[in-house]
């Protein structure tokens, strides 16, 4: 979603980047746009919610080691399970599979790609969609309404049905994490974990050429979804909310 936001805002505000054509943007340009957007939205977050000084400081005691492990594992499992469900639907001919991470990795320098995908994009997206959108809805409504609506907004911004489906599921999990710990850095870490695993998988090619039957897709998806229950309970026990 961050790339769609970059194109919308970047074309309007920074037409000089790479001649103003977003299709020609390099990874360096995307990173510069990430930084520009982070600088733009941090003051908006502070002005809207006026967090107490030091309240967003990164401290392991906010989650505990087990809570942080559950957060990363739950985020990755959620993303992978939805990804497998999408691939299964593609096998059945519902829609084509779209791998945005692989496209970006092929597009330029690996180090810059990783910096953009694993570091900048999660920070930017969580600041906007959990820090601003979800928290704004949450200030006037209940958790589930806010989580569903903010995840739907995140999905629409992707401008792609396949990525949008994943965004809804992952967005709900990240909203749950944010609601539980009340610290924005925790969903940022969870999002970074998802992108790091996806990047490592695509770059290493460890899963390329792997073919399994429909039955095993279903079994793996069911097992992953079942594993989310104890993981979410573990997160809830170590958090301050829910």
Show where each model-derived region lies:
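Hydrophobic alpha-helical transmembrane segments
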Residues: 31-32, 68-73, 111-115, 144-149, ...
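Membrane-interface helix/loop boundary segments of multi-pass membrane proteins
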Residues: 124-149, 176-183
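Alpha-helical transmembrane segments in multi-pass membrane proteins
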Residues: 1-49, 218
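Juxtamembrane helix-loop-helix connectors linking adjacent transmembrane helices
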Residues: 17-27, 53-121, 139
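Membrane-interface capping segments at transmembrane-helix boundaries
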Residues: 49-54, 229-242
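Small-residue-rich transmembrane alpha-helices that serve as helix-helix interface/gating elements
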Residues: 214-230
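Functionally important transmembrane alpha-helices
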Residues: 5-12, 151, 162-219
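Small-polar-interrupted transmembrane alpha-helices in polytopic inner-membrane proteins
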Residues: 143-158, 192
């Amino acid at each position: 979603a961050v790339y769609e936001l970059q194109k919308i805002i970047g074309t309007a505000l920074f037409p000089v980047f790479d001649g103003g054509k977003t299709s020609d943007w390099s990874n360096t340009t995307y990173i510069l746009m990430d930084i520009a957007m982070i600088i733009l939205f941090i003051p908006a977050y502070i002005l809207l919610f006026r967090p107490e000084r030091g309240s967003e400081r990164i401290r392991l005691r906010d989650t505990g080691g087990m809570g942080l492990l559950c957060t990363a594992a739950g985020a990755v499992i959620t993303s992978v399970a939805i990804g497998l469900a999408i691939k299964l639907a593609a096998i059945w001919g519902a829609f084509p599979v779209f791998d945005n991470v692989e496209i970006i990795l092929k597009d330029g320098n690996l180090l810059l790609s990783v910096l953009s995908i694993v570091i900048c994009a999660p920070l930017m997206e969580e600041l906007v969609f959990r820090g601003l959108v979800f928290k704004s809805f949450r200030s006037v409504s209940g958790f589930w309404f806010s989580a569903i609506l903010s995840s739907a907004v995140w999905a629409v911004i992707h401008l792609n049905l396949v990525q949008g489906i994943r965004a809804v599921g992952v967005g709900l999990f990240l909203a749950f994490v944010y609601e539980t710990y009340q610290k924005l850095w925790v969903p940022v870490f969870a999002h970074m974990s998802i992108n790091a695993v996806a990047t490592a998988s695509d770059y290493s090619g460890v899963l390329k050429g792997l073919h399994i039957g429909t039955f095993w897709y279903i079994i793996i998806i069911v097992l992953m979804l079942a594993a989310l229950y104890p993981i979410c309970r573990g997160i809830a026990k170590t958090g301050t909310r829910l």
